[in-house]
Swiss-Prot record:
An accommodation pocket formed by Phe-324, Tyr-237 and Ile-283 at subsite -1 (cleavage subsite) contributes to the methyl-galactose tolerance of BpGH86A. GO terms for molecular function: hydrolase activity, acting on glycosyl bonds. It comes from the Bacteria. Substrate binds at residues 53, 76, 78, 87, 114, 151, 235, 279, 326, 331. Disulfide bonds: none annotated. This is Beta-porphyranase A. Cleaves the sulfated polysaccharide porphyran at the (1->4) linkages between beta-D-galactopyranose and alpha-L-galactopyranose-6-sulfate, forming mostly the disaccharide alpha-L-galactopyranose-6-sulfate-(1->3)-beta-D-galactose. Some longer oligosaccharides of even number of residues are also observed. Inactive on the non-sulfated agarose portion of the porphyran backbone. Can also use methylated galactoses. Gene3D superfamilies: 2.60.120.1200, Galactose-binding domain-like, Glycosidases, Golgi alpha-mannosidase II. It comes from Phocaeicola plebeius (strain DSM 17135 / JCM 12973 / CCUG 54634 / M2) (Bacteroides plebeius). Residues 1-22 form the signal peptide. The active site is at 152 (proton donor), 279 (nucleophile). Its EC number is 3.2.1.178. Keywords: Glycosidase, Hydrolase, Signal.
Length: 728
């Protein structure tokens, strides 16, 4: 590998051209020749996302659905404490298990139990309770992969019947968890087979009470039981789950919720323990009960998709996630419930008063699974200029999947870009799922002749584009790593700088961003001065999801992109300063995405001239922005721009850019070895209008790349969207 350089030289004018790449537009860029990794993981693991709350794979209808849609089992309410109470009818008293010394099989689902007085009570011996769970499972032929001992326990800490109430009851519940984890891990027949997770937080409003809720719930749980847990479980809902206010967690709030757990896990244990999202979705409060309705019961599907995009970015640190969809839920279809189905049910009976003689049909929740049916493969590099447009992309051999989700409250137009202009993409199918609040789910599949230049997407709509692609091989990789600070939950004082150190950073060619999570009054500033190793960077005015104006406290993650060249290998520091006081910075995480084969940096000039070195004594170089927010490089006279690039010898590279020229100006692109003078040259011109230009060349040892625009002093040229990538 050798160092290469790019130069851009041209003429300059004060006129601002209409750009073809507009920062004010929703730009989604897909590079399906670059494989994307989350740490060491690239392939989509469907078993972590597409599950239902059922273990009834032996049911004919359920089994067919699981097979047809590639869906897994999720969660079941049954475990050692339900079994014990059925035998002894006394909480804290456990029966003698029949010894079993045969092989233990593991089934992938979560076993959990209700926080009832039959299972836990003040005064119980938590060590005996933990020992019983290990005895129960070690003498079972089949065990669940995950055990979440109590479902949403803390919101029931004041329930009638408990002899201990409030925080004392929550601490007892945590010690109950810790004992279970300790005894299961210490049992040689279970250790390595079962994972204990908790605490199944129903209401993860960490910011409440100036983060007292965090300190007395999840932090307390991690401090007292975290060492015995394999992972931490949280429930994510839009709407009200048991308690709280009717707000949206999808978007920046859920990002901040999970980032805080990860950040403290790193501080406490030196590594991040995995997450389990054992329930997620949306809760509709328009009905007084939990009975099924064709309209209100399917509104949760938009939330399924909103949260799913968040969780897909966490696969490397995720055990499992389960949208809140059950199977037939026959337990709910009783005379007491007027023979209605459960709101979360996926199957509806034609003859509810005689379940032994009925036909079951899938309701419209099936379209969530239809939308994602057969989506699989390796992640590919995809970016969105608007955080409200969530994106994912995968390639499975010659099949490409591009997924878009709209978190915004308004319709959006998304422009789809690809460095090859989609030339090797064909047979495009557009899958669309839209949740109409008053009419239910509208699902369509449409064949389109080619990849659309732009696509419209309304609120609560998710689109999956499925296409054939002839270039099935990957020519580059981009690896995303997260780095966690030793500091978190720092109070904000007006004008006082907060410092967050990071160690072990590996920088390079690629992208970088700061995941800044804050909890402060909704009227307070969300735009501090942020410095990366002493250099100030721009903080955006937009973040994922809504503005949280219906909350007293804004709690959300704001992603701050910056030039990766501001990072150093090794130790780095982030400093932030707010102009006003109040609230906390809850977590700060550095996200670095690094190419294995180096590429040009800041080819869209979104960060001004950063990463580019101006050249020449007889001209001027600058970046100008038009009224629509389009950034382009403007170069005058005998001047230019240079950027060093790492390239590999023996590979074919493609240089591409969008160029506009005036007068007799020509774009001259030179590939030059600075030590030997070896030169490869191409010339292009595009008077008056932007034109996409490109060429391929073979790299040799110590070759240097130079891009030069004409040296005429009285003409003008603009350049944007510069890309240099290997093709083999």
């Amino acid at each position: 590998m050798s160092y290469k350089y790019i130069f851009l030289l041209s003429a300059f004018t004060l006129g601002v051209p209409p750009g073809i790449y507009c920062q004010g537009r929703n730009e989604v860029v897909v590079d399906y020749n670059t494989r994307r990794f989350l740490s060491g993981v690239s392939e989509l693991d469907r078993s972590k996302y597409f599950n239902i709350h059922s273990t009834s794979d032996d049911d004919k209808d359920v089994g067919k659905f699981l097979a047809d849609y590639q869906v897994g089992l999720g969660r079941k309410f049954w475990g050692p404490y339900s079994y014990a109470y059925n035998k002894t009818h006394e909480v804290g008293k456990y029966p003698q298990m029949k010894p079993y010394s045969g092989n233990i099989s593991v089934k992938r689902y979560i076993a959990t139990e209700h926080p009832y007085v039959q299972h836990i009570q003040g005064g119980i011996d938590v060590q005996a309770a933990g020992a019983w769970s290990a005895e129960y499972y070690s003498n079972s032929e089949l065990v669940p992969e995950f055990f979440e001992p109590l479902n949403e326990p803390f919101v029931h800490a004041n329930d009638a019947g408990f002899t201990v109430q409030g925080q004392a009851m929550r601490e007892l519940m945590v010690d109950f968890y810790a004992s279970i984890g300790k005894h299961i891990h210490n049992n040689p027949r279970l250790n390595g087979k079962m994972k204990v997770i908790g605490y199944a937080a129903a209401y993860p409003a960490w910011e409440d009470g100036n983060f007292n809720y965090w300190n007395t719930r999840m932090k307390m749980f991690i401090d007292r039981a975290g060492a015995y847990m394999d992972g931490f479980s949280v429930h994510l809902y839009d709407g009200i789950n048991v308690t709280g206010t009717d707000t949206k967690r999808s978007g920046s709030n859920s990002e901040a919720v999970l980032d805080m757990v990860e950040a403290y896990s790193y501080i406490k244990f030196g590594h991040v323990k995995p997450l389990a999202i054992s329930e997620f979705g949306g809760i509709d409060n328009s009905k007084p009960d939990d009975s099924y309705d064709d309209i209100s019961s399917v509104r949760s599907v938009s939330s399924f998709n909103h949260f799913l995009f968040n969780l897909m970015e966490r696969q490397d640190n995720l055990f499992i996630s389960i949208p809140f969809v059950s199977d037939k839920a026959e337990w709910h279809i009783t005379a007491a419930n007027n023979y209605t189905s459960y709101s979360a049910a996926l199957f509806i009976p034609d003859n509810p008063q005689n379940l032994k003689n009925t036909t079951w049909r899938l309701n419209d929740k099936k379209y969530f699974f239809e939308l994602w049916k057969n989506v699989k493969g390796e992640r590919v590099d995809i970016t969105s200029s608007n955080p409200d447009i969530q994106v994912q992309a995968f390639k499975d051999g010659g099949r490409l999947y591009i997924a878009l989700d709209n978190l915004d409250d308004n319709p959006q137009t998304v422009y789809l870009n690809n460095k090859n202009s989609w030339k090797d993409v064909s047979n495009v199918t557009k899958r669309s799922l839209y949740v109409n609040y008053n009419a239910g789910i509208e699902y369509t599949e449409q064949n389109v002749p080619s990849m659309p230049e732009s696509i419209s997407i309304v609120p609560n709509q998710t689109i999956v584009l499925v296409a054939d692609v002839s270039s099935s091989a990957f020519t580059n990789s981009i690896i995303r790593n997260k780095y966690y600070s030793s500091e978190y939950l720092k109070p904000i004082s007006a004008g006082s700088s907060l410092s967050f150190p990071f160690t072990g950073i590996e920088s390079g060619s690629g992208r970088a961003s700061l995941r800044m999570s804050i909890g402060r009054p909704v009227s307070a500033s969300k735009k501090p001065v942020v410095k990366i190793n002493g250099t100030a960077v721009s903080v955006p005015d937009n973040w994922k999801g809504y503005g949280q104006s219906n909350r007293n406290i804004f709690f959300g993650m704001i992603e701050v992109p910056f030039d990766i060249q501001l990072l150093k290998n090794g130790d780095n520091n982030v400093d932030i300063t707010f102009s006003d006081g109040g609230g906390h910075v809850s977590s700060m995480i550095l996200q670095v995405e690094k190419y294995t084969v180096s590429t040009l940096q800041n080819g869209t000039f979104s960060e001004g001239l950063s990463a580019w070195q101006p050249l020449g004594n007889y001209g001027t170089v600058c970046v100008q922005t038009d009224n629509a927010g389009n950034n382009v490089a403007c170069i005058s006279g005998h001047a230019g721009l240079m950027q060093r690039v790492d390239m590999e010898s023996g590979r074919t590279y493609r240089f591409s850019a969008d160029v506009k020229t005036e007068g007799a100006c020509k774009l001259k692109v030179m590939l030059q070895d600075m030590s030997t003078g070896t030169v490869y040259t191409e010339e292009f011109s595009s008077p008056g209008n932007y034109k996409a230009v490109s060429f391929d060349f073979n790299s040799t040892v110590k070759k240097v790349v130079c891009a030069i625009v004409c040296e005429r002093q009285n003409d003008a040229a603009w350049i944007d969207n510069i890309v240099l990538l290997p093709q083999n």
